[in-house]
From Swiss-Prot:
Gene it is expressed from: EIF4E
PROSITE patterns: IF4E
Classification via SUPFAM superfamilies: eIF4e-like
Stored PANTHER family: EUKARYOTIC TRANSLATION INITIATION FACTOR 4E, EUKARYOTIC TRANSLATION INITIATION FACTOR 4E RELATED
N-acetylalanine modification, residue list: 2
Major location category of this protein: cytoplasm
Name of this protein: Eukaryotic translation initiation factor 4E
Organism classification: Eukaryota, Metazoa, Chordata, Craniata, Vertebrata
Region of interest (EIF4EBP1/2/3 binding), residue spans: 37-40, 73-77, 132-139
Swiss-Prot/TrEMBL GO biological process terms: mRNA export from nucleus; regulation of translation; translational initiation
Binding site for mRNA: 56-57, 102-103, 157-162, 205-207
Length: 217
């Protein structure tokens, strides 16, 4: 005679342990949370402190290099704002391999778009303008002409501060003027404010306190 097997109730699975929960959560973690966002170029931040007992090059110090968005912000949030630097100090941000001096191979035929600030603008505009300048550089904001950009410098001075973007070839009118127009727009400068581009060679051989502008926007 056939026998009927008694029905069995499936045994419920035990609740997951904390370890299993953690493993499960890790599997679905958003990779955006731990993958850094690479920049197109590697950049070097330099600091200059004017000590008259030392040579110019001895006063120039490399702070750090970075090539991701996250590493840039970690560095920027760690250092002093430009407005807090002592007069005579500079920050320079240049593509890795280019030193922040006229004599560098990439700079010697170039020039700079120069922003001059009065003393009152140190508190109102200096830090904002410098950050926007840096973001223009690392974000490659100058379209097809970003390769012409070498770096940027902020000079903190008692008489008035300066910010400049350096380009590699002062004779390249198309690249230089495009960079100048984009830069002026990014800083939010009104049309009546004119900024000028000066070659490093003219700056080095100037007679008097001013250097003639090759281009203006």
């Amino acid at each position: 005679m056939a026998t009927v097997e008694p029905e069995t109730t499936p045994t419920p699975n035990p609740p997951p342990t904390e370890e299993e929960k953690t493993e499960s959560n890790q599997e679905v973690a958003n990779p955006e949370h731990y993958i850094k966002h690479p920049l197109q170029n590697r950049w070097a931040l330099w600091f200059f402190k004017n000590d008259k007992s030392k040579t110019w090059q001895a006063n120039l110090r490399l702070i750090s290099k970075f090539d991701t968005v996250e590493d840039f912000w970690a560095l920027y949030n760690h250092i002093q704002l430009s407005s807090n630097l002592m007069p005579g100090c500079d920050y320079s941000l240049f593509k890795d391999g280019i030193e922040p001096m006229w004599e560098d191979e990439k700079n010697k035929r170039g020039g700079r778009w120069l922003i001059t600030l009065n003393k009152q603008q140190r508190r109102s505009d200096l830090d904002r303008f410098w950050l926007e300048t840096v973001l223009c550089l690392i974000g490659e904001s100058f379209d097809d002409y970003s390769d012409d950009v070498c770096g940027a410098v902020v000079n903190v001075r008692a008489k008035g501060d300066k910010i400049a973007i350096w380009t590699t070839e002062c004779e390249n009118r198309e690249a230089v003027t495009h960079i100048g127009r984009v830069y002026k727009e990014r800083l939010g400068l009104p049309p009546k404010i004119v900024i000028g581009y000066q070659s490093h060679a003219d700056t080095a051989t100037k007679s008097g306190s001013t250097t003639k502008n090759r281009f203006v926007v």
